[in-house]
């Protein structure tokens, strides 16, 4: 009798350290601040609105800094629903619920984020969070479809290469070796400068194939 086949790769698709929510903010805060700084103020009415918005953001940021748990983070969202601190609070809620094993609540927080802030620089990361929760819950087909959605909707985001890598790794876990190899190859060629490309090259090496050469810049 042949020994039972062992998975090529075990464990979570991505280590949490690869997607720390603090890293999301650190990686994108310059873009967020640049967008805010690019707003041109014209007229008293706009200036008054901007002052109100600034005060709202400042108050929301203060409340966020004092938040100690999920209920207090939700209070930031409820009281200041259209502010950047509210977006930050929703991402923290999603992460906290995930860490507590509440995948449905975590996914609900991610989807709430996407509904409220569809153009936010972290929207791709929120959708990738949905995919990771689906994978953790065993809903593999939905996880793969959501990963594809990240790449399609947010191709320029930091989340896109991680989503493509995640899909390939799910295929690898399911012993779909050739499909996984094609997925890793795609990450290397389409996102050559990303950490996911280096991870994909490592997987290709383990599978006995060479990573494709990165395209010339």
Residue positions per predicted region:
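Extracytoplasmic/periplasmic/luminal assembly and interaction segments
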Residues: 74-125
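Short solvent-exposed coil/turn linkers within tandem alpha-helical repeat scaffolds
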Residues: 31, 79-86, 114-123, 151-160, ...
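N-terminal positive-inside, membrane-proximal cytosolic segments immediately preceding the first
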Residues: 1-38
